[in-house]
Structure formats: C-alpha cells, structure tokens
Regions:
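Structured catalytic-domain cores with a bias toward divalent-metal coordination
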Residues: 1-445
Length: 445
C-alpha cells in the first residue's frame, strides 16, 4: 500500500460526525445544476441518512427544486404527491412508502426515507404550492403500473383516447403482467408491442396542449395540478415505451439493456429539469454504479455508459457534482437471489488493497475526501477495486464479483467513507417472520 497515497488521503480527509462537517461537500456545490449522491449498497442506513442530510442542506441553502431517485415513477409519484400535499395524497409517509410492492421493497420502503419524506412535507407546508420540492422516480421497471396510470389519466380527459390506449396496451394481455414472459416471447416472435407503446406516447404528446386547455377551460381547475397530472401521464407513457424496449433488449445480454436503462434515467432527469424551468436544479439518489463516471471504471471497456458519465457529458463537469459512498465493513439489507426474502447480512472487511482498505488504513474512521486533492498522486490514478453491493448479495463470494476497478479521482468529485456501516430499517417484514422482526433487525436510524 502506497505511503504517498495514505499521506494524500490524510491531507484531503475531512472528519464526518455532524451536519456541519458536510460543509466539505456543500462548498463544492457552488452554482452546479445537478448533484448526484450515490451509495455503495441499496441497504445501508448511513448511506441513506447522510444522503438525506446533504439533500436537506442543498434544498435549504442552495434552493434545489427536486429529488430524483433510483425508483419506479408511479410509486415515487405517490411520495411526491404526499410531500407536496397534492390532492389524493396518502395520510403519511409511512403509509405511502409501505405501499411499495415491487421487490426489493426495502430500497425505498424504509424508516430512513420515511423520515426524509416527512421532513420534506413539513418543509413544503411552509411554501407556496409552486415552490414545493418534489420527489420523483427515475427508473424504467414499472411497465404495467405506468400503463395503468396512463389509462386513468385518459379516462378523465379523453374517453375515446382512453379506449384506443386500452386496445393498444392490450397487446401485453397474453403475458399476464409477467415481464419475463414478454421478454422471452419477443426473442422468438417477431411481433412485439413496440408500435403500440410508441403510438400512445406520441398521441399523448401531440394532444398535451389540448388536454391542458380543456382541463382549465371551466375556470375551476387548479392550473398547477393540471400541469402536474399531464406531466405525470406523459412520463408514464415514456416509461411504458422505454420499459417495453428494456425488457425486449434484456434477453439479448450484453450492455444494451443496462445502457437503455441509464439513458432512460437521464432522459427523465432532463424532463424534470425542463419541467421545473431553465433555472432549476436537481438532486439524484442512485447507486454508485449509476452516478460514478463509468469512464473511470472497467464498465467503459464493456461498452457500458451510466448516468454520471452521461450527465457530465451533457451538462459539463463544472455543472455536475458526483458524490460516491464507501464502507469498510458492517451490515446490510439484501437478498441472496433475485426475489429472495430480505436479510440482515454481515459485510466482511474489504478486500486487501481495495479503495475501502486504503481508506480504512488511514485510521480516521468516517470522513469526506474531495478527490481532486488526489490527482497529483500517481497511485491514485491506478485502478483499485471499489466495493459495490446490489439488492442481491452473497458475502461469501464478494471477493470475486463485488469490486469495480476504479480510478477514484475520475469517478467522483467527492467520496464519503463510513468505516463501519449498519443495515437500514425496512418497513416490510418477511411473511415467515410471523410479524416479528428478527433479533438482528436494525432498530435505530
């Protein structure tokens, strides 16, 4: 392990104990339009908690307009509805988030997000409706939920268009809401549902002005709400189009489906920025594998792009801040296979000579590293493994598959290191828990 690198890390290190210590991050924000906050797992309390703390300060001190997360648009729209006190909102953040039903539920249905959503609601209650901060989902997985949302909107504004959309979306009926069945069928049957979802999106965009003017014609409708509901419907139609392409592409393997997903997330981010106006600023919450620049990893060699890379390329390095997270050891919520029950798992000490190992070797505990301070150190430009834990995790095998070769100063502008981390607190328990959490279930924030 390089002494020069350890010395450089110690020089760049800023301790992390209180909200005031986040000044080291906030000082880097300046006038940047997009701040992307990562996570090294989808089940670590400290990643969620510190990310929320940074976000609160970005909203209060820098006037950011929305939070966009690695979640489904329809589910996150209900959080947005509650946080902004829009008509039809649920009674509380716990109820809204507990209704998240797609595995892995714990990603957003957890106490850490409940606390943030309640804070956002309280903060928004003090603002005029047009100044309230929103909460949105960037992901592409909600094919059927998004089609249902489009139909509900059209039924309210255009019965004939709703019937046409119902017939078009009926193309998916044989697959009984099973995306795997549709994906496999598209591999062997030349006739897919692509034209149908593209057509509905095109029609909805073409008639958007008419729908808005007709909704407002009577004079009783709330203009802000009318615009929000139209935007929601258009986004759901876009999700349906891109989800169809994603599942059709997924069965072919390779980088194409990954790229399509991240391109969709960037397209959604672009739409949110445009929707909130030319001076708008957005905060993104996603896994490190999405927000860290792919060009600084081995992803690029595999033909993969990601959100961090694409946003830097689109808006420029000076208008984007990428903040990654890491942990040396601890516990995490994950499943042992896709769809498996959630578990509290032990995260072993990081692999020797990984970035986590080097950060631990400083002996500084939890801290913040502004990575441009490392650019002058030759060892910092070498690729080292950087741990990435997804919703599926098998600790016994992590040495062979959970480390992404990374040039740290190129991948992130800032890294937040939690030396010993703990599992987050999901709202759902497994069916076989008999309603009682296991002894190892996290009880604190």
């Amino acid at each position: 392990m390089s002494r020069d690198l350890i010395r450089a890390l110690n020089d760049a290190w800023r301790p992390l104990e209180t909200d005031a210590d986040l000044d080291a991050v906030l000082e880097r924000v300046g006038d940047r339009r997009v701040v992307l906050l990562g996570e090294a797992s989808h089940g670590t309390s400290e990643f969620y908690t510190w990310r929320a703390r940074i976000t609160k300060r970005l909203i209060e001190e820098h006037g950011f307009h929305f939070v966009a997360v690695e979640g489904d648009w329809p589910d996150c729209w209900e959080v947005n509805r509650y946080a902004r006190a829009l008509p039809g909102a649920g009674p509380g953040a716990h109820d809204v988030l507990h209704a998240f039903h797609r595995w892995p539920t714990w990603m957003w249905a957890n106490r850490e997000v409940v606390e943030f959503a309640e804070w956002l609601r309280s903060r928004n209650d003090e603002r005029e409706p047009e100044s309230r901060v929103g909460f949105y989902g960037l992901d592409v997985y909600s094919l059927w939920d998004s089609m249902d949302a489009v139909l509900r909107y059209l039924e309210d504004v255009d019965a004939e268009a709703a019937e046409r959309a119902r017939n078009a979306y009926g193309c998916f009926d044989p697959y009984q809401e099973d995306v795997q069945e549709y994906a496999l069928a598209s591999r062997y049957v030349p006739q897919t549902c692509e034209e149908e979802v593209v057509g509905i999106l095109r029609d909805l965009r073409h008639k958007a002005g008419r729908y808005l003017s007709e909704t407002l014609r009577g004079g009783d409708a709330d203009p802000l709400l009318a615009r929000e509901l139209l935007f929601d419907a258009q986004q759901n139609a876009l999700v349906a189009k891109n989800a169809e392409a994603y599942y059709r592409t997924m069965v072919r393997g390779g980088a194409a489906s990954w790229n399509l997903r991240d391109l969709h997330m960037v397209e959604t981010l672009d739409r949110l920025l445009a929707h909130h106006g030319p001076e708008s600023r957005g905060i993104v919450w996603e896994h490190n594998t999405h927000i860290g620049d792919a060009r600084a990893t081995d992803m690029a060699a595999g033909g993969m792009v990601n959100v961090g890379q694409l946003v830097r390329e689109k808006y420029g390095d000076d208008d984007v801040l990428l903040v990654g997270f890491s942990s040396y050891e601890g516990t995490v919520i994950a499943g042992r296979w896709w769809g498996a029950p959630m578990e509290v798992m032990h995260v072993p000490r990081a692999r020797r000579d990984s970035w986590e190992d080097v950060l631990h070797a400083t002996g500084r505990g939890d801290g913040i590293v502004v990575t441009d301070a490392l650019a002058r150190v030759a060892d910092a430009s070498a690729r080292r493994g950087h741990r990435a834990i997804g919703v599926v995790y098998q600790p016994a095998h992590e040495m062979h598959g959970n480390y992404v070769p990374t040039v740290l100063p190129d991948r992130y502008d800032v890294l937040i290191h939690i030396d010993r981390s703990s599992a987050l607190a999901p709202l759902h328990y497994r069916a076989d828990d008999d309603g009682e959490p296991p002894e190892t279930f996290p009880t604190g924030m």
